[in-house]
């Protein structure tokens, strides 16, 4: 997880507390990415704002399952959910500017770089810059959606 912005959790109780805190939070949706009965990752919609109709998306795939198409499919399904179920107008994300592979993937899904946040997060002993990337609903539906309406 070279480009993850947060420190790992230290214990199961820490994760249980996080789960309890967030299970009823209407501003978040989490989806487990599975291969059969094995969890291979998670995709999340965060900071869901029903007034401005915006939300943040993030995805994590276990490195041992990388390059198998899980991220691509889960990412597109999460975007479909945001636009077609939650009726969001915009989905945005933050990505380390050095994570060129991720930036390329997001751009291939019509996300545009909207700006750079200087020294926005601290990891591995240094401050890192990140891009804010966004996608408007009108640029997603009828172009890249897995769900055809």
Annotate each language-model stretch with its function.
Residues 38-41, 101, 127:
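Glycine-rich acetyl-CoA-binding "A-motif" of GNAT/NAT acetyltransferases
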Residues 67-81, 103-108:
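Conserved acetyl-CoA-binding loop-helix of GNAT-fold acetyltransferases
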Residues 7-66, 136-140:
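Acetyl-CoA-dependent GNAT
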Residues 84-94:
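Conserved GNAT acetyl-CoA-binding A-motif
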Residues 92-95, 112-129:
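Conserved catalytic-core motifs of GNAT/GCN5-like acyltransferases
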Residues 71, 75, 98-102, 119-124:
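Short glycine/proline-centered loop/turn elements that form peptide/ligand docking sites
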Residues 62-64, 68, 84, 97-98:
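Active-site acidic-Proline motif in GNAT/NAT acetyltransferases
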Residues 147-149:
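Conserved small/polar residues in nucleotide/adenosyl-binding loops
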């Amino acid at each position: 997880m070279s480009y993850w912005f947060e420190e790992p959790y230290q214990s199961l109780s820490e994760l249980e507390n996080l789960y309890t805190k967030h299970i009823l939070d209407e501003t978040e949706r989490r989806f487990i990415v599975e291969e059969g009965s094995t969890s291979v990752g998670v995709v999340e919609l965060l900071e869901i704002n029903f007034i401005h109709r915006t939300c943040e998306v993030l995805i994590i795939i276990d490195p041992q399952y990388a390059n198998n198409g899980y991220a691509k499919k889960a990412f597109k399904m999460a975007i479909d959910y945001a636009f077609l179920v939650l009726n969001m107008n915009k989905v945005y994300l933050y990505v380390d500017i050095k994570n060129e592979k991720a930036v390329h993937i997001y751009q291939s899904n019509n996300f545009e770089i909207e700006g750079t946040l200087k020294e926005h997060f601290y990891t591995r002993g240094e401050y890192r810059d990140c891009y804010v990337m966004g996608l408007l609903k009108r640029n997603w539906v009828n172009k890249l959606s897995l769900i055809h309406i």
